[in-house]
Amino acid sequence: MKKEELQQNMKDRMQQFEDGGLRLLKKGQKGIVHAIFSRFGLVLLLMLLQVGVLWSVFRWFGELLPHYFGGSVAMSAFMVVYILNSEMDNSAKITWMVTIAILPVVGVPLFFYVKSNIGHNALKKRVTRLTEEARGLQPQPLVAAQELAEADLGAASLARYLHGKGGGFSVYRNTEVTYFPSGEAKFEELLRQLEKAEKYIFLEYFIIDEGLMWGRILEVLARKAAEGVDVRVMYDGTCEFTTLPRDYPSRLEKLGIQCRVFSPVQPFVSTHYNYRDHRKILVIDGKVGFTGGVNLADEYINHIEKYGRWKDAAVMLEGEAVRPLTILFLEMWSILREPEFEKFLSVPPHSVPAEGFAAPYGDCPLDGERVGEMVYIDLLNRAKRYIHIMTPYLILDGELETALKFAAERGVDVHLILPHVPDKKFAYALAKTHYKSLLDSGVKISEWLPGFVHAKVFVVDDSEAVVGTINLDYRSLYHHFENAVWMKDTTCIPAIEKDFQKTLEFCRDVEPTRESIWEGKVLLHLAGILLKVIAPLL
């Protein structure tokens, strides 16, 4: 499309927000009523019908068993032995054993359906091939590896894991890392950097929603596309259920912006939909990259209020370590097309003199390697003085809970900040079920009173930190595509710890008593107890 046509499309197809930015949707194209009578309503209805049919089949099958009770007991016993000998997390084993023991005719087929991975085998093969191809594009810079080993053998061992079994991610020097303690701070710098784009802009986000934030960004993207910049946008398919219409990619493409939707939700029951793209990546010309917890919607910059004040965090990378973010984006972009690695990675990485080391990495739920969790556990095991954590959720498996408790029992100051105002009541209830055990081991827990904490931050001993998208829950650690940046001795680490301490000023400290943990909320307490049985399935 010619430059003049793109500019005309900008004028014809967009409406200005009162406070700037651009809009592709008319006001009123959201809300429950719109959702019910949209594709969302149709997909939900068809899925419910399929679930109803499956339930009827299971009940019919149960009625056909001549000796139902004896058969169900034998079936349950066999499955318990099978699950006990599987490689699942212990919490997941308990969940499945309870489900099968109570509802064997439903639980057994459900277990095999979920574990057979029907619906995403093709995706797994494609992602595996792309990941292997990308490994060769990230050779470990020898100087960086040697200098890291000389500085800290423990940190060097983590770098070896990331470059080996962790997915082929290298550790880089010559990268300036800037920390943003809020979505507002990231947004301001992001707009400034977008204006500098000359070759390409890549965006991959879990949530995009029309409003001030996305409108301001979209205005720049459309203008840059008209100038000849290669602009690509990718978002998760759940946006079609919650924020954007199905035809939104075509609306963007009329502005010269390429757009793809990861795993659009179709009206078929499938385990494929369990794997969501929770990453948040923005890359500009291979020189500047952003990541962290901030999605592209107004609540993330406190332009609107959903759950009180919104607390988030992000980082900007300038230099060599932007390369892995470019690769992660191109991997996801290429799932349904031929990869374009060489087109964007043929030139040497952009270098910016800076202190410390940075290693952006991704986590894929289809390769059996829980990279995000392994990095967190390694930091907990190597911490000497303190490890300070901000996370929106706390739904732990046995390994991570043990690592948190063991670090505290070694005398490390383990301190977690969680939200006092939750976005999901069930997640809030589940988090509180872990409080007593952690507190009794010496872990400190504080809840941020002004609202919702969405930041995913680890900072350790004034020397290491992780900022990214990876929550402390089963969905992030087991089922989502995620990403983060591990840092060692970068100049921004003091700013991360300073932000933790400043956030702590507006928190309430939780004591290891029922009154302090549950605050007299009996129903919430009961919900937490019941939900914990099925936590790995949530």
Language-model-detected regions and their locations in the chain:
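A short glycine-/small-residue-rich loop at the edge of a beta-strand within enzyme catalytic domains
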Residues: 367, 391, 395, 422-429, ...
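N-terminal localization/anchoring segments of enzymes in phospholipid and broader phosphate metabolism
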Residues: 1-374, 378, 382, 422, ...
